[in-house]
Amino acid sequence: MDEVPSSDESKSASSGKRVLEQSVHELEEVFKKFDANGDGKISGSELADILRSMGSEVDEAEVKAMMEEADTDGDGYVSLQEFVDLNIKGATVKDLKNAFKVFDRDCNGTISPAELCETLKSVGEPCTIEESKNIIHNVDKNGDGLINVEEFQTMMTSEMTDKSK
């Protein structure tokens, strides 16, 4: 018999999206502070200035390494989307793993269409098995018809960062 998540677990799963949405909004505000000239992107010099103003002793090589990590499109600047992606992926891995456990009802390391549907229904989201299969199909990188923890993290972070575009 499937174990039904407690109301606390269900609240945790549904509140996870709200927390991520709030995080995106907060990151947008931080981004605006980093973006000293207001051009919608952070340059290496803006990053260095803000880090130094916060008391961080960073050298040019460290700033360059930070920029390379964040600047995924290689244009030499960090866009809002890149900034949000970098911060959400690092900050929420533990939260997402905890949310994954709520969906993985049989604790086998994957979420089946039935588990996805049951969990969504338990938090008041209408769902059919067919809809669950479609959701899974969109994020199922390895083609096994299930969602593993990495695919779940990708699904959740892309859903949140899409809202900041």
From Swiss-Prot:
Binding locations of Ca(2+) 2: 71, 73, 75, 77, 82
Organism: Hesperocyparis arizonica (Arizona cypress)
PANTHER family attached to this UniProt entry: EF-HAND CALCIUM-BINDING DOMAIN CONTAINING PROTEIN
Residues that coordinate or bind Ca(2+) 3: 104, 106, 108, 110, 115
Positions annotated to bind Ca(2+) 4: 140, 142, 144, 151
SUPFAM superfamilies, A to Z: EF-hand
Keyword match Repeat: yes
Gene Ontology MF terms: calcium ion binding; protein homodimerization activity
Every EF-hand domain range: 22-57, 58-86, 91-126, 127-162
Residues binding Ca(2+) 1: 35, 37, 39, 41, 46
Pfam families found in the cross-reference section: EF-hand_7
Record SMART domains: EFh
Keywords: Allergen, Calcium, Metal-binding, Repeat
Expression (tissue specificity): Expressed in mature pollen grains.
Keyword Signal: no
Subunit structure, as described in the record: May exist as monomer and dimer.
Record protein name field: Polcalcin Cup a 4
